[in-house]
């Protein structure tokens, strides 16, 4: 018997098709000023409206200003006829896709999501849908795409919003996952958590790194110096991370260069605190420059959650693996110092592969870790360990790998399963209530 949710979608589909996709409808036109949605078309996009589309659904802009953007571009690199759909604008810049649209104002009911999808894709044909979900919007939009166009649906989880924290309802996630022919996650803990909860197979696709930047041979160790110095990469996902790290580093007698987004729309990243901590902010720089810069340091700091009561959302922090960790070790083999809880995915990753150390938000512990990691023998050991796994983290051929995997409904090969063979993905979860109001849908 048809599940009531699917039955509801079937009714919506036929009703909206009659309204929006009837044969007598006029040809699709670009929305004019004041229209609900504006579709931005790339100068290189085909004019053939019968071309099969690869639709990519994200929460916000695909841009270099946050970690998701570069990764989305890498895994979809070279795909033809990409139509990028997002729920909202947060960064002021989007530079991805042959066509892109922001579905704002956001849908409030299931019917509105169906209508929005059919409005922007009227008279088009969709082959595949790649969904990188974070908000409820991405789930509903992807369900509508799958139902209305019969496209193959792939989910690529980069962050958790359902298992460790309940920002997305279980019923919605279950409906969405049941529709997916391929389910991917960036790391084993995220894979296992969703696999265990929903009884559906997930596979791993890590945050791959540009092949042109991947270092093949072990990089040389750097000579020791009297003053501690290193780099800082990654994002601050909670104000407490920033405050704690600045406080810790201010007592470590160190010089740190920060390469990352210093203008967060959500947190107060005080320049005064940076100066006191010995941190020089360089902002976001092109990845090829970042790879060269990282080769100049004995270690790189990546902040993660402390997983305590000072944080606003330990659930998201507990199940996330910062992609910049993989970027650093693959491009420069630089040892990684995780500052935060040893129970986070970042800490587990560096310990499993022997590419770094973990220290809590404590100045004595962080100073001692910096000193140990700067010693020649530690440099040699960690850089050799990084060199062993770097080639597997390359994005060489990854867009073809993903396209083929979506087509057959399983990983095209076992390269990533082999990489994480023997990896302990079990993780202690303390489920949290929602801290954000997902759109109230019915």
What are these regions (language model features)?
Residues 165-183:
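Membrane-proximal helix-turn-helix segments that form the acceptor-binding/catalytic region
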Residues 64-78, 211-216, 221-290, 295:
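Conserved catalytic-core segment of nucleotide-activated headgroup transferases in glycan assembly
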Residues 1-94, 247-252, 430-433, 439-442:
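N-terminal subdomain of nucleotide-sugar transferases
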Residues 178-216, 225:
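Donor nucleotide-sugar binding/catalytic pocket of nucleotide-sugar-dependent glycosyltransferases
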Residues 151-167:
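A short, histidine- and acid-enriched strand-loop-helix "catalytic/donor-clamping" loop
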Residues 237-240, 286-292, 300-330, 335-348:
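Nucleotide-sugar-dependent
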Residues 360-368, 374-428:
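A charged, aromatic-enriched C-terminal amphipathic alpha-helix characteristic of glycosyltransferases
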Residues 129-148:
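An aromatic- and histidine-rich active-site surface loop
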């Amino acid at each position: 018997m048809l599940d009531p949710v699917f039955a509801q979608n079937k009714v919506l589909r036929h009703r909206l098709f009659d309204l929006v996709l009837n044969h007598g409808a006029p040809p699709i036109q670009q929305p004019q000023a004041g229209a609900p949605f504006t579709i931005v078309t790339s100068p290189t996009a085909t004019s053939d409206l019968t071309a099969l589309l690869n639709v990519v659904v994200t929460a916000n802009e695909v841009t270099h200003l946050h970690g998701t953007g570069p990764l989305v571009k890498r895994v979809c690199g070279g795909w033809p006829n990409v139509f990028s759909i997002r729920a909202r604008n947060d960064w002021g810049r989007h530079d991805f896709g042959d066509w892109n649209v922001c579905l704002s104002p956001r849908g409030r009911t299931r019917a509105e999501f169906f209508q929005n999808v059919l409005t922007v894709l009227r008279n088009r044909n969709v082959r595949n849908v790649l969904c990188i979900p974070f908000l409820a919007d991405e789930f509903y939009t992807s369900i509508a795409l799958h139902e209305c166009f019969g496209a193959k649906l792939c989910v690529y989880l980069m962050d958790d919003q359902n298992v460790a924290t309940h920002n997305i309802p279980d019923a919605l996630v279950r409906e969405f996952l049941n529709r997916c022919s391929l389910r991917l996650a960036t790391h084993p803990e995220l894979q296992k958590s969703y696999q265990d909860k929903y009884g559906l197979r997930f596979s791993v696709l890590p945050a791959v790194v540009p092949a042109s930047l991947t270092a093949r041979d072990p990089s040389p160790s750097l000579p020791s110096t009297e003053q501690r110095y290193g780099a800082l990469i990654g994002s601050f996902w909670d104000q407490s991370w920033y405050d704690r790290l600045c406080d810790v580093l201010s007592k470590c007698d160190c010089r740190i260069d920060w390469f990352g987004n210093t203008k967060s729309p959500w947190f107060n990243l005080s320049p005064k605190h940076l100066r006191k901590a010995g941190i020089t902010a360089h902002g976001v720089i092109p990845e090829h420059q970042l790879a060269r810069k990282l080769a100049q340091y004995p270690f790189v700091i990546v902040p993660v959650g402390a997983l305590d009561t000072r944080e606003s959302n330990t659930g998201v922090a507990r199940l996330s693996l910062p992609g910049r960790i993989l970027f650093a070790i693959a491009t420069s083999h630089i040892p990684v110092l995780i500052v935060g809880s040893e129970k986070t995915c970042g800490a587990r990753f560096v310990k499993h592969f022997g590419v770094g150390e973990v220290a809590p938000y404590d100045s004595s512990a962080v100073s001692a870790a910096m000193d140990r990691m700067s010693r020649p023998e530690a440099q040699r050991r960690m850089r050799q360990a990084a060199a062993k796994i770097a080639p597997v983290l390359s994005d060489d051929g990854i867009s073809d790998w993903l396209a083929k995997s979506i087509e057959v409904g399983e990983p095209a090969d076992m390269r990533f399963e082999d990489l994480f063979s023997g990896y302990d993905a079990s993780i202690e979860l303390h489920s949290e209530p929602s801290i954000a109001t997902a759109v109230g849908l019915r």
